[in-house]
Curated annotation (Swiss-Prot):
Induction profile: Immediate early (EI) protein.
Biased composition (Polar residues): 116-143, 162-171
Effect of C19G: Loss of SP100-containing nuclear bodies dispersion
Protein name in the entry: E3 ubiquitin-protein ligase IE61
UniProt feature, compositional bias: Basic and acidic residues: 228-238
Known role: RING-finger E3 ubiquitin ligase that degrades host SP100, one of the major components of ND10 nuclear bodies, thereby disrupting the organization of these bodies. Also plays a role in the inhibition of host NF-kappa-B pathway by blocking the SCF(BTRC)-mediated addition of ubiquitin chains to host I-kappa-B-alpha/NFKBIA, thereby interfering with its degradation.
EC nos: 2.3.2.27
SUPFAM superfamilies: RING/U-box
Zinc finger residue ranges, RING-type: 19-58
GO molecular function: DNA binding; ubiquitin protein ligase activity; zinc ion binding
Length: 467
């Protein structure tokens, strides 16, 4: 084999080859044994997880050679065809409900019909030994759990502590590899995505609240739920000891890298990590629901919510695309996404720092600080005082230019019902005339009549006098 490796394409020739699985340049060369065909290691490892035949010659693959440095320095990844028997057998139902107190027997598959090996649930006291009423060839009365002489088959079974009020249930599955993949957290790249299944060893260590409430939430385990193709988004990490993004699957790293860079543009460094964990929690709740994500994130992102959610869902689709799970490493910078510039500013704030209401009557007068600088201030009132929005009305004649300032601020709580008190101030020192009219047009008409009557004969146009 040393001679074959020396004569074959080593790491120096990996850049000249093309992987027939991902149709890209070979990255991290992997050679199949015994046919010695070249592929990307991640591609051929994902291929052999579903089929043990070589993609080129269709011969059975026994192992995969990778990390080839020299003829004597390499690593070998063994392929076990028996690990996938549980997913190919038609013996299981669509789902298996696992409740607290269930005992899962991890025995080899029986030679007979596998449907008969699944025992019906039987109610027994939790203090009695759990066994089948009619012991078969795979389950006999000699397998009773005893403290004096524990057997080897006892170590393969998962027996969590049960309560007196909960019945014991025995379920025997025909394939041990299927249940090992469901319960044990040793799958590559999805360690933090494994849910806590009630009835396993890990669930016995989890705190339970609400008495028997957890019994109302059985966990359904599907047959074709391959750990490499997740149906849900694994963002609720449980590995608290792992720092940074290492607790999440490797195929989610482009999305996590974009979140780090984007949130660093919008927020202060000390709140980037808590904000990222909150956003990932919302993704775990809403998934790809764009409306739900926008509603939940609007309090954090304000006007930047729309483009932020659009970019996030775009990267989420690329990360979870099954055709990209076996491709080479990529980052969000390889896409056309551009970062949103920050910082985040709360919208619709007045010059005094008070957030305006959502009422259309207020927002059409004061929306931005640029419009506030165009308003005039009443004589004797300090600039910046909370007296509401001011609007100028210009009436131009041949030699007169009058400026009326109208204060539309409510002086009582009755402003919410639509009744507002309006005051009129004249630059020539005329007395203020309060008007309680319900419509703005009526108040303006009244003010126009008063001003035209006071300035009669001073060059005011005839059109204004008639009005």
């Amino acid at each position: 084999m040393d001679t074959i490796l020396a004569g074959g394409s080593g790491t120096s020739d990996a850049s000249d080859n093309t992987c027939t699985i991902c149709m890209s340049t070979v990255s991290d060369l992997g050679k199949t044994m015994p046919c010695l065909h070249d592929f990307c290691f991640v591609c051929i490892r994902a291929w052999t997880s579903t089929s043990v035949q070589c993609p080129l010659c269709r011969c059975p693959v026994q192992s995969i050679l990778h990390k080839i440095v020299s003829d004597t320095s390499y690593k070998e990844y063994e392929v076990h065809p028996s690990d996938d028997d549980g997913f190919s057998e038609p013996s299981f139902e669509d789902s298996i409900d696992i409740l607290p107190g269930d005992v899962i027997d991890l025995l080899p598959p029986s030679p007979g019909p596998s449907r008969e090996s699944i025992q019906q649930p039987t109610s027994r006291s939790s203090r009695e030994p759990i066994q089948s009423p009619n012991p078969g060839p795979l389950q006999s009365s000699a397998r009773e759990p005893t403290a004096e002489s524990p057997s080897d088959s006892q170590q393969d079974s998962i027996q969590p502590p049960t309560r007196d009020s909960s019945p014991g249930v025995t379920k025997t599955c025909s394939t041990a590899s299927f249940l090992r993949k469901v319960f044990f957290k040793d799958q590559p790249a999805v360690r933090s995505a494994t849910p806590v299944v009630y009835g396993s060893i890990e669930s016995a260590q989890q705190p339970r609240t609400g008495g028997q409430d957890y019994r109302d939430r059985p966990v359904s385990v599907g047959i074709n739920q391959d750990p490499r193709t997740m149906d849900r988004l694994p963002f609720r990490a449980t590995d608290r000891g792992t720092e940074g993004n290492a607790r999440f699957p490797c195929y989610m790293q482009p999305l996590l890298g974009w979140l780090d860079d984007q949130l660093a543009e919008l927020y202060q460094p000390e709140i980037v990590e808590p904000t990222k964990m909150l956003i990932l929690n919302y993704i775990g709740i809403y998934g790809r629901d764009e409306a739900g994500l926008k509603t939940s994130l609007r309090c954090l992102l304000h006007d930047s919510t729309g483009p932020f959610v659009t970019n996030m869902l775009f990267l989420l689709d690329r990360c979870t695309d099954p055709t990209r799970l076996t491709m080479q490493t990529w980052t969000w910078k390889d896409t056309a996404i551009q970062l949103i510039t920050g910082p985040i500013v709360r919208p619709e704030t007045t010059s005094t720092g008070e957030t305006s209401r959502g009422d259309e009557r207020d927002t059409r007068l004061v929306n931005t600080p640029q419009k506030v600088r165009l308003f005039s201030v009443l004589p004797g009132i300090k600039p910046g005082s909370a007296r509401g929005a001011k609007r100028r009305l210009f009436h131009t004649g041949r030699d007169v230019k009058r400026c009326l300032t109208i204060d539309l601020t409510s002086e009582s709580d009755s402003a919410c019902k639509g009744s507002k008190t309006r005051k009129v101030a004249s630059p020539q020192g005329e007395s203020n005339t309060p008007s309680t009219s319900g419509s703005t047009s009526g108040s303006l008409k009244h003010l126009t009549k008063k001003s035209s009557a006071g300035k009669a004969g001073k060059g005011i146009p005839n059109k204004m006098k008639k009005s």
